């Protein structure tokens, strides 16, 4: 008789894990749809590239480790890693970037530690940060939302730009990034940070086309609301708990409000922080990763609050416009310490 030796954790429930990952993938549909609507078909192409890359990379490592490829890939975690990375990068980023980031996330940030359940850092955010540090220009080249864009690439144009850098008519990223004011557009957070450093007043900045939205940046507010809708559905399905999203958003809103009240000429208003960038994606889909987040209820509140504080600090005073990825990874580092001091007292034992 042959016995198969499996690595810990031995209580791992494959069916339950697969179901939760599938629920998260389904909950991402509103956010993906919003990004497709406002930023074009490039998002879908990036998702397909990332998904295939994640599956192939994990299959290769599992084969080398002589583990069951089919059984492991059925947990859907590889697909989720690819999806989270794909929706975090600009929709028309070169194809090799999403492949590189996804392969790094799947192999180095996940399988190198032993696979799902043993990685200390969120794999998708590791891949994102590697790309952001290595290729900052490409990683910050977001298209303007279609409502303020001059050139809206179709499906074929998106594929051509991703794989060749040019559309069929010879257009490139510089022409595609032009807004209705004839100026290359950036995200609301990037525009605010750059303009403040250039000495522009907040009143002037709020007149830019990118801030033509009702609540925050054009397009971005609806993208964030779509991710919020998906996150609320996850809460309703009990696929995630409320502690991390709530503490993250409350802390971010509180810090942003206090900062804005004390320095309204240099710091962004709270609605811009809450409805721009990757705020809602981070709150409900990234920080709630059960493997890399805190495991106690008090710990989850602390973990979410820490991430919210870090996001505000990085956005307001750091060198990057959106600090969600860095905040997630920095918060991941503190998880063992948080869990140690927030673990429930064993019955019959004194505190201390």
UniProtKB/Swiss-Prot annotation:
Entry keyword Nucleus: no
Gene Ontology terms: cellular component: plasma membrane
A Pfam family the protein falls into: NQR2_RnfD_RnfE
Topology in the lipid bilayer: Multi-pass membrane protein
Top-level taxonomic group: Bacteria
Enzyme Commission (EC) number: 7.-.-.-
Cofactors, names only: FMN
Keywords: Cell inner membrane, Cell membrane, Electron transport, Flavoprotein, FMN, Membrane, Phosphoprotein, Translocase, Transmembrane, Transmembrane helix, Transport
Modified residues (FMN phosphoryl threonine): 187
Keyword Transport recorded: yes
Top enzyme class: translocase
Subunit structure: The complex is composed of six subunits: RsxA, RsxB, RsxC, RsxD, RsxE and RsxG.
HAMAP family for the chain: RsxD_RnfD
Protein name according to UniProt: Ion-translocating oxidoreductase complex subunit D
């Amino acid at each position: 008789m042959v016995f198969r030796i499996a690595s810990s954790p031995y209580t791992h429930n494959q069916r339950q894990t697969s179901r939760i990952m599938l629920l998260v993938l389904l909950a991402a549909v509103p956010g993906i749809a919003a990004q497709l609507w406002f930023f074009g078909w490039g998002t879908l192409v990036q998702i397909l590239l990332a998904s295939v890359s994640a599956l192939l990379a994990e299959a290769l490592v599992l084969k080398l480790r002589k583990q069951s490829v089919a059984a492991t890939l059925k947990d859907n975690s590889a697909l989720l890693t690819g999806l989270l990375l794909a929706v975090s990068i600009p929709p028309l980023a070169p194809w090799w970037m999403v492949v590189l980031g996804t392969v790094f996330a799947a192999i180095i940030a996940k399988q190198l530690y032993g696979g799902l359940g043993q990685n200390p850092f969120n794999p998708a955010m590791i891949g994102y940060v590697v790309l952001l540090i290595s290729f900052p220009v490409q990683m910050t080249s977001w298209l303007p939302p279609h409502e303020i864009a001059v050139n809206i690439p179709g499906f074929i144009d998106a594929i051509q730009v991703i794989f060749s850098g040019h559309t069929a008519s010879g257009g490139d990223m510089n022409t595609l990034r032009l807004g209705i004011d004839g100026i290359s557009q950036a995200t609301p957070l990037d525009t605010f940070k750059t303009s403040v450093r250039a000495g522009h007043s907040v009143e002037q900045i709020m007149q830019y086309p990118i801030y033509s939205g009702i609540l925050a940046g054009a397009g971005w507010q609806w993208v964030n609301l779509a991710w919020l809708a998906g996150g609320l559905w996850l809460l309703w399905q009990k696929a995630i708990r409320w502690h991390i999203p709530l503490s993250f958003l409350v802390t971010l809103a509180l810090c942003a409000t206090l900062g804005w009240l004390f320095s309204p000429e240099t710091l962004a208003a709270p609605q811009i922080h809450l409805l721009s960038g990757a705020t809602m994606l981070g709150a409900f889909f990234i920080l709630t990763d059960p493997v890399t987040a805190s495991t106690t209820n008090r710990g989850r509140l602390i973990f979410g609050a820490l991430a919210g504080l870090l996001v505000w600090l990085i956005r307001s005073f750091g060198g990057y416009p959106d600090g969600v990825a860095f905040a997630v990874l920095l918060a991941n580092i503190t998880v063992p310490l948080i869990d140690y001091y927030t673990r429930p007292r064993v019955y019959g034992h004194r505190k201390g």
